[in-house]
A protein has these predicted regions:
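Glycine-rich phosphate-binding loops that contact phosphosugars or nucleotide phosphates
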Residues: 49-161
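Cofactor-/ligand-binding subdomain signature composed of acidic, glycine-rich
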Residues: 1-51, 158-161
Length: 161
């Protein structure tokens, strides 16, 4: 969060203005981070994307769920892969509606803090129900549970924005 956040700033729109002004720096930093990790990211993703029945779920809590809603159709049409967007609240309340143990799964989790209880629970449920489950959390918080769990796991790769 920007250092000048206060409830008063949020109420007056200063918070929103700061978030908007922060975007160019944030995108450049994110692209630099991804560029530095490109080889390792490709090494993680390439074998997964070759799996015939791979299911890819884009998920997040609240506004982070909208990311998946926006990009899943484009990714599916441009890659021919099985992408779907499922909010973490849906995954947590009805996991068997979305998690098929017969197919490998790549769960791409979006979360600014990486600490929302439903995001962490979605990862745990995916691991519990899908024997061949992989994770790609994309978060802004290296201290968050999504990031920390991924960097300490053999079946995950984490991206820090």
């Amino acid at each position: 969060m920007p250092k000048n956040y206060t409830p008063a700033a949020a109420a007056t729109g200063t918070w929103t203005e700061e978030e908007i002004r922060h975007q160019p720096r944030a995108w450049i930093r994110s692209l630099t981070n991804i560029d530095a990790l490109r080889s390792a990211l490709n090494n993680f993703l390439e074998p997964l994307l070759r799996k015939e029945n791979l299911r890819i779920i884009l998920t997040g809590a609240g506004t982070s769920a909208f990311i998946g809603d926006i990009i899943a159709p484009w990714l599916a049409s441009h890659t021919g892969k099985n992408f779907s967007a499922v909010p973490t609240t849906d995954l947590v309340t009805n996991p068997m509606d979305y998690l098929n143990p017969a197919h490998p799964l790549l769960l791409i989790s979006f979360g600014r803090s990486g600490n929302s209880p439903e995001s962490v629970a979605a990862v745990e449920l995916a691991n519990q129900f899908v024997p061949e489950c992989y994770h790609l959390p994309i978060t802004c918080n290296e201290a968050g549970a999504l990031y920390q769990n991924a960097i300490n796991s053999d079946n995950a790769f984490a991206l820090l924005m």
